Regions:
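Active-site loops and adjacent core secondary-structure elements that bind or stabilize anionic groups
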Residues: 1
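Internal helix-loop-helix
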Residues: 5-72, 76, 80-81, 128-133
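Cysteine-centered functional microenvironments
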Residues: 20, 88-92
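A short, Trp-centered hydrophobic/proline-enriched beta-strand micro-motif
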Residues: 80-89
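Active-site-adjacent elements of ketosynthase-type condensing enzymes
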Residues: 94-100
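A short core secondary-structure module
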Residues: 111, 115-152, 156
Length: 159
């Protein structure tokens, strides 16, 4: 119960989306605000404040690289803190060397089939929000670089 009340307090303060554009419900504050307030939060409870930090990374990624449709659909709920976000990067064979990633994403109609194994997904499962947006690093066929695939609807990931 404590962590839910703490997250509600953080969410209601506007901290989660403080540096996001106002058009998505954010505060429009400079990024230095996030750095300073994040340092204070991390000093008090690093494990907890990883959640909003990971959400911030997901928001910035969608803001910078997402289509207009993705921005309109997901940023308001992430910015408000109603949803949280993660980055699914680490695999057993590549801790910090992401070039060794083996997970693939194969296009099928209007979605992708992901094949691979991710480990250590910080804040990948919790009960603080009704939904968690997962940005999954994977290889697409014929793509020269790695890609991020979003899993955005409440779903159960299968082993």
């Amino acid at each position: 119960m404590y962590k839910r009340q703490l997250y509600k307090t953080v969410r209601d303060s506007g901290y989660v989306g403080a540096t996001m554009p106002t058009e998505f419900g954010g505060g429009g504050a400079p990024f230095t605000t996030a750095i300073l307030s994040g340092e204070i939060g991390i000093a008090s409870n690093m494990a907890f404040y990883m959640g909003p930090g990971l959400s911030h990374g997901a928001m910035k990624t969608i803001l910078k690289k997402g289509s207009e449709e993705l921005k309109q659909k997901y940023l308001p709920k992430l910015v408000s803190g109603e949803w949280m976000g993660t980055m699914c990067l680490t695999e057993p064979q590549c801790g910090t060397d992401l070039g060794l990633i083996k997970t693939t994403a194969n296009p099928i109609d209007d979605h992708y089939e992901l094949n691979g194994q991710k480990i250590w997904i910080s804040f990948g499962e919790h009960d603080l929000t009704e939904n968690i947006i997962h940005l999954v690093l994977a290889k697409l066929p014929d793509a020269p670089d790695l890609s991020l695939i979003h899993i955005s609807e409440p779903t159960r990931l299968l082993a």
